[in-house]
Amino acid sequence: MTIVLGLDGSMTAFGWAALRLGESHELDEPVGLGCVRTSKEAAARHVYMADDDGRRLDEIADVLIAAVQLYEPRLIVIEAPAGAQHANSAKALGLSYGLSRTLARCFDVPCITVQAEEPRRVLVGRRNASKTEMEDWCLSRWPTSLGLLRPKASKPEREGAFDALTVAATGARSAVAGPLRPQRKAIVRASWDPTEPSQG
């Protein structure tokens, strides 16, 4: 089983999706889907913001490490940070992106990055497709994928998980993923017809 792991980085709702590659992308199938939720607790814990960020990264890393160990992906696909962000948002995106790259490096898994609008363009055909449209695309393509999420998943969890699934699906269509796909078994035909009478 060849798996592509898609990651949609965020400090608040970090989505991940494991996509099993088929002989063609029409035969790809999600086998794992989830989202890690974390929240700021620096004030409540009376700790520095940097230490609280570290705690949140640890929580995310624990889940991602477990996913890599379980699914043993052959390729990790990450959505690149994009858009104008204020300082805190930019820092959060940078931390989550760095965590994704480090995860791939530590497990020696090839890693590629896709731009934020690329899944929308490749899968839906419009760069400005909404998160709801992307989720609808996933559910139309894989009707049972919602069952991979935990019961009563919140809207942010669904968005993070399905964003990660579209990232994985986009990466699965890349030139890098092509050689990883299982090959169709060749049909060996007999050089003689067993129904014909033997000669000699």
Question: Residue spans of the language-model regions?
Answer:
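Phosphate- and other anionic-substrate recognition elements at nucleic-acid/protein interfaces
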Residues: 1-200
